[in-house]
Amino acid sequence: MNPVYSPASSGVPYANPKGIGYPAGFPVGYAAAAPAYSPSMYPGANPAFPSGYAPGTPFKMSCSPTTGAVPPYSSSPNPYPAAVYPVRSPYPQQNPYAQQQGTYYTQPLYAAPPHVIHHTTVVQPNGMPAAMYAPPIPPPRPNGVTMGMVGGTTMAMSAGTLLTTHSPTPVAPHPSMPTYRQPATPTYSYVPPQW
């Protein structure tokens, strides 16, 4: 252990064996006693900062510390007035990119908060594809009756009908196309660019 270091404060001034001069008012020793603890940061009462809640005061406090007046109690848990930021409506809004109405599904343009998109703080809209395009028209459903089959029968009952049905006419053979260019010496020469 360092013999010069003493963990317990002796209350006496430091030894100054080398005679180092300190400026006037420099504390060369420990104070006699630490100042008493005060629960308030500022000594004395400050009218700008209310010391606490009086019984029966509403739970919200004024944003400006210059007045002691407290805004009236509101049963809403939202501390901001209604005009500060938009409130999500229960009705779907028309998508700004889909100009027609009716056939287009309406769903709000939802932007993911920045912490959802990793490694970037850019807020990117991710509600686009379903709202931009019209719903697909499904193809007509088959009615369950096979071609050449009598309705209301099973496959075994109509096997003869299936086998004797007229097969479609064969497609005519495709016309033969000549090769695009006969392999020969090209009729042009390569001219290098002039720049």
From Swiss-Prot:
The gene is fam168b. It is a multi-pass membrane protein. It is found in: Cytoplasm, Perinuclear region; Cell membrane; Cell projection, Axon. Signal peptide: none annotated. InterPro entries: FAM168A/MANI. GO terms for cellular component: axon; perinuclear region of cytoplasm; plasma membrane. Inhibitor of neuronal axonal outgrowth. This is Myelin-associated neurite-outgrowth inhibitor. The keyword Membrane applies. It holds the Pfam family TCRP1. Residues 1-18, 164-195 are cytoplasmic. The keyword Transmembrane applies. Residues 44-143 are extracellular. Its main location: cytoplasm. Keywords: Cell membrane, Cell projection, Cytoplasm, Membrane, Transmembrane, Transmembrane helix. The chain crosses the membrane at residues 19-43, 144-163. Belongs to the FAM168 family. It comes from Danio rerio.
